[in-house]
Amino acid sequence: MSLFPSLTLLLLSVVATSYSETVTCEDSQKICPAVIACNSPGINGFPGKDGRDGTKGEKGEPGQGLRGLQGPPGKLGPPGNPGSSGSPGPKGQKGDPGESPDGDSSLAASERKALQTEMARIKKWLTFSLGRQVGNKFFLTNGEMMSFDKVKALCAKFQASVATPRNAAENRAIQNLIKEEAFLGITDENTEGEFVDLTGNKLTYTNWNNGEPNNAGSNEDCVLLLKNGKWNDIPCSSSHLALCEFPI
């Protein structure tokens, strides 16, 4: 057997192998399409890293699907600030008079009667022991001696006023009550020689002693009821019996 054909085939194989390392598969097909074949593809490499996120796209149109059910209500929010008060409503109609049991009504009447009886008894006791009543006035003394200003304060404390006789009957009642000379609610402190009561009204009744008022010492601005029932002007700072009158 001849070795030439075998040697020729071996040389062609070597040349094809060395040439395929520098020539691309495409070029090799052009050069030697009938003799040299391309190698098979290699194994795929590892995936590359993800690229950066792109810019946000525009909002798309609503889908064509059915609208979902309404979700549950959210939590209650904090209470708001209190509102301003509204305007007052119209006045309601007068109600019907109430009804009280007959027993309560009769009890109240009996209690009032008992209270009135007790007050009358106390008034009689005061009149007998400490005071005198004339008409709708009740004259009362505590037996203490003090200045005119203190007498005014004492009477005002008991919602009374300094005794001021308006007629002879009241003057006589005071005279019979006192055992000492007492202040009257009369003065000329505002205008010398013009005696008025403590409300500023001019006197409609007087009972001055002979030669009075004389303003001795130029400081006699108050009036004293003497034991004989006559009046005398004296200094307001002197101390005399406190005498008050109470309206009844």
Curated annotation (Swiss-Prot):
GO terms for cellular component: collagen trimer; extracellular space; multivesicular body. CDD domains: CLECT_collectin_like. Disulfide bonds join C155-C244, C222-C236. GO terms for biological process: complement activation, classical pathway; complement activation, lectin pathway. Hydroxylation on proline residues within the sequence motif, GXPG, is most likely to be 4-hydroxy as this fits the requirement for 4-hydroxylation in vertebrates. Residues 82-91 have a biased composition (Low complexity). One of its GO terms (molecular function) is D-mannose binding. It holds the Pfam family Lectin_C. Residues 42-99 form the Collagen-like domain. Oligomeric complex of 3 or more homotrimers. Interacts with MASP1 and MASP2. Interacts with MEP1A and MEP1B and may inhibit their catalytic activity. The coiled-coil domain mediates trimerization. Calcium-dependent lectin involved in innate immune defense. Binds mannose, fucose and N-acetylglucosamine on different microorganisms and activates the lectin complement pathway. Binds to late apoptotic cells, as well as to apoptotic blebs and to necrotic cells, but not to early apoptotic cells, facilitating their uptake by macrophages. PANTHER family: MANNOSE-BINDING PROTEIN C (PTHR24024:SF34), PULMONARY SURFACTANT-ASSOCIATED PROTEIN A (PTHR24024). This is Mannose-binding protein C. It comes from Chlorocebus aethiops. The lineage of its organism: Eukaryota, Metazoa, Chordata, Craniata, Vertebrata.
